[in-house]
Amino acid sequence: MKTKVLKQALFFTFLSICLFVSTTAFGQKVNLSGNWKLNEGKSQLGEGRFRMAPATVNITQDETTLNMERTSKGQNGQDFTSKEKYTLDGKECENTGFMNSVKKSTVTFSSDNKTLTITSTTTFEREGNKMEIKQVENFKVSDDGNTLTLDASSTSQRGERKQTLVYEKAK
């Protein structure tokens, strides 16, 4: 009788440990941290004259914050780096961008925590006209941690634009 009770207690203890480990391992949110370099051959830059993408993206992420530095070539051929800071609590945050634009963004995670989504609205003035760009960026890291894929779409007065950017972790 004592052996049966002991076996049941041991079984439920083991089951509880397995359940805890599996929910901890599978519940972990994607972490985008790393220095990433664009693989132009694997990327789809979209159509039109704005076929450009950051050549490098450097990301640091902790439990509450995502910091991102995107470096692109400017029109004059020199590097241009934009720095953005996002909160991971689902609340709106603001970043200042090109032409004194204001980018309001919210970060969310997919239900399986494998995709980080940044939903943004950027407002700015150009030649006296107020402009607005709405953007959704979905970031995923490959299982081996060496590839970052960014599916991005944006909408403005000039139409819709879609890109799939593939970055490889810099060695």
Regions found by a protein language model. Name each.
Residues 1-7:
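N-terminal secretory signal peptides that target proteins for export/translocation
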Residues 7-8, 36:
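Short helix-onset patch at the extreme N-terminus, typifying the N->h transition
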